[in-house]
């Protein structure tokens, strides 16, 4: 069985806020095209206490399509959780593609590792258990022009997205893409105030309001904010 549309967290997280439309998209377009190992990983993750952090299947297909259109080979992922977006990326990259994946919690990554191994893409992944900022700063010190990344995906601690951006805009090549997940935050970013959120959710909401304004004014990137999942902002590096 696929994800239950009755699962509050799944509907609440999706920007559509429509159970019927979400069900239609998932069952008509997403689940039929979902890789067997992604399906298995999704079903295991849905039982996890933090299942709301799972990247939705329709968003996964979107990421896969973008990676293939870009012909991406070198990518970086900040925030891995159980690895649904990571496995999506690994499947989309060519056989010699490489992913640098950074997360503070390796135990979550190990939930998804058997599915990554069964998919035959473990060799593409370099997992680093660490806070992301020190790793990114070290990369900046050692990076050569030919080592720049084609693509980055960020789905980690929300209050640090702007700090990640300052590093990634130097680590991703000109013409490459930096994607930020959850930037519409349940749709709550549209309002100056949004009563009822838990304190940590409110911190994230305010962080995203600031980030969205910041990215819109950043001349180093052109952006598109996509209403899929909980909102994905694509920033293409210009210089």
UniProtKB/Swiss-Prot annotation:
Name the enzyme group at the top EC level. transferase
Name its co-factor(s): Mg(2+)
Give the GO molecular function terms: metal ion binding; O-methyltransferase activity; S-adenosylmethionine-dependent methyltransferase activity
Q: Does the keyword Hydrolase apply?
A: no
> What's the catalysed reaction?
norbelladine + S-adenosyl-L-methionine = 4'-O-methylnorbelladine + S-adenosyl-L-homocysteine + H(+)
InterPro entries found in the cross-reference section: Cation-dep_OMT (IPR050362), SAM-dependent_MTases_sf (IPR029063), SAM_O-MeTrfase (IPR002935)
Sorted alphabetically, the Gene Ontology BP terms of this entry are: alkaloid metabolic process; methylation
**Keywords, in A-Z order:** Alkaloid metabolism, Metal-binding, Methyltransferase, S-adenosyl-L-methionine, Transferase
Pathway listed: Alkaloid biosynthesis
Q: Which residues of the sequence carry a binding annotation for a divalent metal cation?
A: 155, 181-182
Residues annotated to bind S-adenosyl-L-methionine? 55, 77, 79-80, 85, 103, 132, 157
Annotated EC: 2.1.1.336
What Gene3D superfamilies is this protein classified in?
Vaccinia Virus protein VP39
Q: What does this protein do?
A: 4'-O-methyltransferase converting norbelladine to 4'-O-methylnorbelladine. 4'-O-methylnorbelladine is a precursor to all Amaryllidaceae alkaloids such as galanthamine, lycorine and haemanthamine, and including haemanthamine- and crinamine-type alkaloids, promising anticancer agents.
| PANTHER family listed in its UniProt record | O-METHYLTRANSFERASE-RELATED, TAPETUM-SPECIFIC METHYLTRANSFERASE 1
Q: Tell me its family.
A: Belongs to the class I-like SAM-binding methyltransferase superfamily. Cation-dependent O-methyltransferase family.
What is the recorded name of this protein?
A: Norbelladine 4'-O-methyltransferase 3
Tell me what organism the protein belongs to: Narcissus aff. pseudonarcissus MK-2014 (Daffodil)
Q: What is the lineage of its organism?
A: Eukaryota, Viridiplantae, Streptophyta, Embryophyta, Tracheophyta
């Amino acid at each position: 069985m696929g994800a239950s549309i009755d699962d509050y967290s799944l509907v609440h997280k999706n920007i559509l806020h429509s159970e019927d439309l979400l069900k239609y998209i998932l069952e008509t377009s997403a689940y039929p095209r979902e890789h067997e190992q992604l399906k298995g990983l999704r079903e295991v993750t849905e039982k996890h206490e933090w299942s709301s952090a799972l990247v939705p299947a329709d968003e996964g297909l979107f990421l896969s399509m973008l990676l293939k259109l870009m012909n991406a080979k070198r990518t970086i992922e900040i925030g891995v959780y159980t690895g649904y977006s990571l496995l999506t990326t690994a499947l989309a990259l060519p056989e010699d593609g490489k992913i640098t994946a950074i997360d503070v919690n390796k135990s979550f990554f190990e939930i998804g590792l058997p599915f990554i191994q069964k998919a035959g893409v473990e060799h593409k992944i370099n997992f680093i258990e660490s806070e992301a900022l020190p790793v990114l700063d070290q990369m900046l010190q050692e990076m050569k022009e030919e080592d720049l990344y084609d693509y980055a995906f960020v789905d980690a601690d929300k209050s640090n997205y702007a700090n990640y951006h300052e590093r990634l805009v130097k680590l991703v090549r000109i013409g490459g893409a930096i994607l930020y997940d959850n930037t519409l935050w349940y749709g709550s970013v549209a309002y100056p105030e949004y009563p009822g959120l838990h304190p940590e959710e409110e911190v994230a909401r305010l962080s995203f309001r600031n980030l969205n304004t910041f990215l819109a004014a950043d001349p180093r990137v052109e952006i598109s904010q996509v209403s899929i999942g909980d909102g994905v902002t694509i920033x293409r590096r210009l210089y």
